[in-house]
Regions:
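Non-catalytic pre-domain segments flanking phosphatase-related domains
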Residues: 1-3, 215-253
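N-terminal helical cap/lid subdomain that shapes the substrate entry/recognition surface
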Residues: 1-86
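Conserved phosphate-coupling serine/threonine residues in phosphotransfer and NTP-handling enzymes
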Residues: 8, 106-108
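A short, structured active-site edge motif that brings together acidic residues
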Residues: 38-39, 122-137
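Short acidic-hydrophobic, aromatic-tinged amphipathic segments that line or gate anion-handling sites
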Residues: 130-131, 197-205
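Conserved Lys-Pro-Asp/Glu-containing loop-to-beta segment of HAD-superfamily phosphomonoesterases
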Residues: 138-166
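Acidic, Mg2+-coordinating phosphoryl-transfer loop and its flanking beta/alpha structural elements
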Residues: 156-200
């Protein structure tokens, strides 16, 4: 099971969107409120890809410079103040105890995602993490599919891009977190229209939903996994964790 981070695990979308609006105004002259909406409308992809879509005529070097500024300010102005949605710690524990293998696919830089998740006590639950330098959401899914060729994948995200990325690959089930921030709303109906098998404003009911989507008699076996290191798939196994502990004790593969 593959989780997006910003806006899905972390309640940080509003903070990040204000950073983006300020950065885009300073770099390209777009009014901040308008730039913020443009960012929200294209969220779900790496920021560099958003810039290429929003400002295709800007030189690539300039877009890279703006992206660096955004990532730096996101750390100090968003991640420094953001935390997980209230249900997330308990949810991750329930999923792990239920045998689900968990991983991260984020448009943020992997190194910063690692730090934030560690700070919030969440990194322990995830087997692997792919970030912006590892490609787009679709490319992350392709890599997960390569490592888990026979197992269905579940992508949990909060954007149209997340839903469409999941729909672009056979065998991927998409789950959506609906959101409401100032000036921007994505309803459960929006996310279902873009392909979500289930969507809500909270993920607290996700374990029960998964039991309906993946009954025990359809649970993939261990043979569905490939050997070696591995990110998350929808494959289940016996419960493996009782709670956070030393990182060295985490079993991979």
């Amino acid at each position: 099971m593959i989780f997006d981070m910003d806006g899905t695990l972390l309640d940080d979308l509003s903070l990040i969107s204000h950073v983006a609006g300020s950065v885009l105004q300073a770099a390209f002259g777009t009014p901040e409120a308008e730039a913020r909406i443009h960012y929200l409308a294209t969220t779900g992809m790496p920021f560099e890809a958003q810039l290429a879509q929003l400002y295709p005529h800007a030189p690539a070097d300039e877009r890279r410079r703006v992206a660096r500024t955004f990532h730096e300010r996101k750390v100090t102005e968003a991640y420094a103040h953001a935390g997980p949605f209230p249900e997330i710690p308990k949810l991750l524990k329930r999923l792990s105890q239920g045998g689900w293998t968990l991983a991260i696919s984020t448009g943020a830089e992997a190194e910063m995602a690692e730090i934030v998740l560690e700070r919030e006590g969440l990194r322990f639950w995830f087997e692997d993490l792919l970030g912006s330098r590892d490609g787009t959401k679709r490319e992350h899914l392709q890599e997960y599919r390569r490592r888990y060729p026979s197992a269905p994948l579940i992508l949990v995200g909060d954007s149209r891009f997340d839903m469409e990325a999941g729909q672009s690959m056979p065998g991927v089930t998409t789950i959506g977190r609906a959101s409401t921030v100032h000036g921007w709303t994505l309803t459960p109906a929006d996310l279902r229209r873009w392909g979500a098998a289930w969507a809500d404003y909270s993920l607290a009911r996700l374990p029960e939903v998964l039991d309906q989507l993946f009954p025990s008699d359809r649970t993939p076996t261990a043979e569905a996994r490939t050997s070696g290191n591995g990110p998350a798939s929808a494959a289940r196994g016996p419960p493996r964790r009782e709670g956070p502990g030393p990182r060295a004790s985490r079993r991979r593969g």
